[in-house]
C-alpha cells in the first residue's frame, strides 16, 4: 500500500538517483532536521546536487539506460562496408550525446529540445564524419547546426548507429526505438514466422529501402505496427 516516505528515505532516493551514491552531509542535515520534504528546500537541494560534479553519474547512468548509450561501445558496423568506422568515432558518438544530455539538464531546457535542438557537440573526428568544416583538435565544443537533418537526438551518430544493422540502416529498428524510448508506446512483438524481406525486385533490380518496407506495410498482419514505425 502507498505510504509517505521519511525525509531520510527521500534523501537516500534523491542521492542515489542524481549521484548514484550516498547522501552528503548537507543533504543528510536537511533530512535529519525534517525540512527536506518542504518544496522550497527540496528544490534547492536538487539544484545544488545537479550543479555538483557528482551529477555526472546521472548523465552516464540515466542517459546510458534511457537512450541505450551503454550499448555504444559494443557497436561494430561491417568494416568492409564502413572502413572509416573505428574506436575514435565510436567514442565521439557517445560523448556527443552525453554532452548534449548534460547541456539540456544544466540549462533547464524543455524536453522537446531533445528532438529540435539546433546545436550539438563535436570534436575534429566527429565533425569530419558529419562533414562539418573548420573543427580541429580532440576537444569537444558546442556548435550551431546548419543542416536541419542533424537536429536533436535523431541526428546523432550514436542513435543512428544503435538503431541500424551492421550492414545497413533500419527504419524499423529506429521506429521501434522511438516508440519505446521517446513515446513510451512499445509495439507488440512481431507475429511468428515473418519471412525476411525480399531485397530484389521481380526484374532483378535491388529494392530501395522504401520499396522493401512497403512489403511489410502491404501485409495486413504487419501493417498496423509498421505504419507507426
What are these regions (language model features)?
Residues 12-16, 124:
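Contiguous, well-ordered alpha-helical segments that form the cores/surfaces of helical PPI scaffolds
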Residues 118-121, 133-134, 197, 229:
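Active/binding-pocket-proximal capping segment
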Residues 1, 127, 142-229:
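Sequence context surrounding c-type heme c attachment/ligation sites in exported
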Residues 1-12, 23-106, 113, 163:
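Long, ordered, helix-rich scaffold segments
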Residues 58-62, 109-116, 137-139, 178:
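Surface-exposed patches in mature extracellular/periplasmic domains of secreted proteins
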Residues 82-124, 128, 143, 147-156, ...:
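Extended, non-catalytic substrate-recognition/exosite surfaces adjacent to catalytic cores, especially
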Residues 26, 130-142:
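Short, well-structured beta-strand/strand-turn elements
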Residues 16-20, 24, 33, 52, ...:
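Short, well-ordered loop/turn and helix-capping segments at boundaries between secondary-structure elements
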Amino acid at each position: 500500500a502507498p505510504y509517505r516516505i521519511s525525509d531520510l528515505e527521500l534523501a537516500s532516493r534523491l542521492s542515489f538517483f542524481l549521484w548514484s551514491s550516498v547522501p552528503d552531509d548537507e543533504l543528510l542535515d536537511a533530512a535529519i532536521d525534517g525540512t527536506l520534504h518542504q518544496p522550497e528546500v527540496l528544490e534547492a537541494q536538487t539544484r545544488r546536487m545537479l550543479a555538483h560534479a557528482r551529477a555526472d553519474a546521472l548523465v552516464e547512468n540515466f542517459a546510458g539506460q534511457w537512450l541505450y548509450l551503454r550499448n555504444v561501445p559494443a557497436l561494430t558496423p561491417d568494416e568492409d562496408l564502413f572502413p572509416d568506422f573505428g574506436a575514435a568515432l565510436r567514442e565521439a558518438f557517445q560523448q556527443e550525446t552525453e554532452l548534449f544530455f548534460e547541456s539540456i539538464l544544466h540549462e533547464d531546457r524543455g524536453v522537446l529540445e531533445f528532438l529540435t535542438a539546433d546545436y550539438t557537440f563535436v570534436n575534429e573526428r566527429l565533425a569530419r564524419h558529419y562533414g562539418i568544416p573548420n573543427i580541429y583538435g580532440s576537444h569537444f565544443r558546442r556548435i550551431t547546426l546548419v543542416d536541419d537533418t542533424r537536429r536533436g537526438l535523431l541526428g546523432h551518430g550514436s542513435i543512428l548507429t544503435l538503431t541500424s544493422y551492421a550492414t545497413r540502416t533500419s527504419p524499423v529498428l529506429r521506429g521501434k526505438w522511438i516508440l519505446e524510448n521517446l513515446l513510451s508506446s512499445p509495439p507488440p512483438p512481431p507475429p511468428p514466422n515473418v519471412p525476411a524481406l525480399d531485397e530484389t525486385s521481380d526484374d532483378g533490380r535491388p529494392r530501395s529501402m522504401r520499396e522493401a518496407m512497403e512489403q511489410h506495410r502491404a501485409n495486413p498482419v504487419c501493417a498496423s505496427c509498421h505504419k507507426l514505425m
